[in-house]
Amino acid sequence: MKKAQTWIITCFCLQLLLLNPLVKAQSSCGNPVTDDVNDIAKLVGNLPNDYLITLKYVPKMDSLPNHCWLHLMVPEFSRSLHNLLQKFSDISDMSDVLSNYSIINNLTRIINDLMACLAFDKNKDFIKENGHLYEEDRFIPENFFRLFNSTIEVYKEFADSLDKNDCIMPSTVETPENDSRVAVTKTISFPPVAASSLRNDSIGSNTSSNSNKEALGFISSSSLQGISIALTSLLSLLIGFILGAIYWKKTHPKSRPESNETIQCHGCQEENEISMLQQKEKEHLQV
């Protein structure tokens, strides 16, 4: 009996260890925003002032909660940064390209990690239903990365409650046209750095479709990773219970024959004692 209890406890502990990665995967992902965002000023200084970066964006509206705006903007920033990264990877004859490439690569990693932290599976219908809110424009580096920083700030504000808030648009939605907050006219000063000669951003249909597939693949890969962990843990749990049941069936029936044997032994002893007493009585009568 003690061996069976020990086996059950051992199986239970093993299941807790196997389910631990699943718990970690579902827990908070921490802070994906690193100090690499501080290099944005350097990157903007390196890019030509007239360089244009294409971005599909959603203007901020009073009827659109900030955390929902974040779900709409993050995938588009991932695509635009990926396209920008690809353009720098095609240039290899300038000394400052490696520095720019490294900065853009770090920013791409940040936005991808941020995208992994968002509950896209929970709000994917919201993103599909509000695709009409997007507008496409070409931004100079200063304005593009100002919008990027705005997205980062919104994430920091709602990081602890993103998985608890559902994105539901009210029945009446403002039209994003002529929104005063869309136009980015405020200027900020960046350190003067020699501008790299870089051709303007021209995203073709093939590049756009490839980047869309990669961004969607990134989202699906994170979801598939969680599903695979869950299935592995559940399968291990099932195997553990099956092994425990088999062990129980093998060990438990053995206790019954032993108990029967002990009962029979006790019966034999009683019969022997009775026969001995009867024999002594006979001997006593004969005397």
Curated annotation (Swiss-Prot):
Membrane topology: Single-pass type I membrane protein
Chain positions carrying an annotated carbohydrate: N100, N149, N200
Mod. after translation: A soluble form is produced by proteolytic processing of the extracellular domain.
Pfam families attached to this UniProt entry: SCF
Residue spans crossing the bilayer: 226-246
Cytoplasmic-side segments: 247-287
Cellular compartment(s): Cytoplasm; Cytoplasm, Cytoskeleton; Cell membrane; Cell projection, Lamellipodium
Disulfide bonds: C29-C117, C68-C167
Gene Ontology terms: biological process: cell adhesion; positive regulation of cell population proliferation
UniProt-recorded Gene Ontology molecular function terms: cytokine activity; growth factor activity; stem cell factor receptor binding
The entry's keywords: Cell adhesion, Cell membrane, Cell projection, Cytoplasm, Cytoskeleton, Disulfide bond, Glycoprotein, Growth factor, Membrane, Secreted, Signal, Transmembrane, Transmembrane helix
Domain of life: Eukaryota
Keyword Transcription part of the UniProt annotation: no
One GO term describing the cellular component: cytoplasm
Alphabetized Gene3D superfamilies for the sequence: 1.20.1250.10
Ranges in the topological domain labelled Extracellular: 26-225
InterPro entries according to UniProt: 4_helix_cytokine-like_core, SCF
Predominant localisation class: cytoplasm
Signal peptide: 1-25
Role this protein plays: Ligand for the receptor-type protein-tyrosine kinase KIT. Plays an essential role in the regulation of cell survival and proliferation, hematopoiesis, stem cell maintenance, gametogenesis, mast cell development, migration and function, and in melanogenesis. KITLG/SCF binding can activate several signaling pathways. Acts synergistically with other cytokines, probably interleukins.
Subunit structure: Homodimer, non-covalently linked.
Family: Belongs to the SCF family.
UniProt protein name: Kit ligand
Protein source organism: Gallus gallus
Lineage: Eukaryota, Metazoa, Chordata, Craniata, Vertebrata
